[in-house]
Amino acid sequence: MHLMALRQRCFGAHAWSLWRYMSSSSHSSAGFNNKKRVPLLWKSSTTTTKPDGDEAITVQLLSWGRGASGQLGGGIEENRLYPAPFASLLLPSSFRLSLPIPGHLPPPPPPPPLPNHLDGNAAVDVEVGISCGLFHSTLLLDGNFWIWGKGDGGRLGFGHENSAFVPTLNPNLDCVRSIALGGLHSVALNSLGQVFTWGYGGFGALGHSVYHRELFPRLVEGSWDGEICHIATSGTHTAAITISGELYTWGRDEGDGRLGLGPGRGPNEAGGLSIPCKVKALPVPVAAVSCGGFFTMALTQEGQLWNWGANSNYELGRGDKVGGWKPQPVPSLKNVHIIQIASGGYHSLALTEAGKVLSWGHGGHGQLGHSSIQNQKIPVIIEALADERVIYIACGGSSSAAITDEGKLYMWGNAKDSQLGVPGLPEVQPFPVEVKFLMEDDGLGTHKVLSVAVGASHAVCLVSRLGC
């Protein structure tokens, strides 16, 4: 058999495209060099064994897509066609994803800890998480965060507007539990339940009553009672949930009602508001929230989905194009238990308790995953993922991602800037494709994807390396 045909048969079309790309890119900054050591960004102070031991595990950050602003973290301006590692973490085996997980219902509370005299070696779990904005990215680890990418507007929070091309520790905020990155700004939640924002303030998404930039993280003085437990943001608006389930929103509203605050313009209504206001029209407590381009979604603790805002592309999934500021449940999901939601620019995803993914809204870039570019009026299960149990979903502006219980990553939608991580795809990829990872000759074994974050034209994922 001809060598080319044999390679295609053995590795598949996408893997062959990847092999061919690597073979022709030896002099490209995006080409893979297995002799280049991935920098160790962080090591647990309690880790005493090697990465292949029982007490430690290697977790890597990989990125792909457009990187002209440094958002890929590799140190240079580059575009990557496939996932490539740019940082490693040596974590205790007890590490977990940082809570709250974006758009996800909170897990059941853990059992109470043993008294110290019964469990003298007990330690607080190390938490790790990632987020992508328009042209910047972040890693959250053990209460600290590293951030990189475009610096315009002060979105990196270093006190200036310079870009960063490698993950850089931000010393201006600690005890961080969750970070959400927007278009030109950033939002963080700390362990005291306080919200901090920084970056471009022209849309009011910072929540500081003024529309100017903030170069450092600044506390949001909200009118809520108690702590905040969940945050979300988009290009121009932000949302926060209190521990009692009240939802507050702020930022830009161009008459579409995405803030959920009323039909007019005023301190308690729907104009672009630069201070947090309670969404009084939401009749039930909520536990998770996701901000789309011009709409908002929220989940109750029982897994019922509510949404509001723009609906010209069926973003709300109600079967018509009638949008508005008033929160309403999605009729076809009345008896479906949703555990996670994710919002794109004009489309929506929902993950059921059974591990199935539903999508609806704008489909022009293939981001709905239904093998077409048609808009979808109501939530429909993505059949290409029907045989998988999905545990995590994410949206970019016009692309989508899902992680299975086996640690496989699928992506679909807009591939114009290689943000799907699979070389050789058309610019519109209308059904999920598995993202393959190169087997580096580093002795760390296979990749298991833990989390993925998708920006407008790039993506970052966390993978555990399962040594042989």
Task: List PLM regions with ranges.
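Conserved beta-strand position repeated across blades of beta-propeller domains
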Residues: 131, 139, 168, 180, ...
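N-terminal mitochondrial targeting presequence
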Residues: 1-46, 51-55
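WD40 beta-propeller repeat fold
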Residues: 40-44, 48-172, 178-180, 185-188, ...
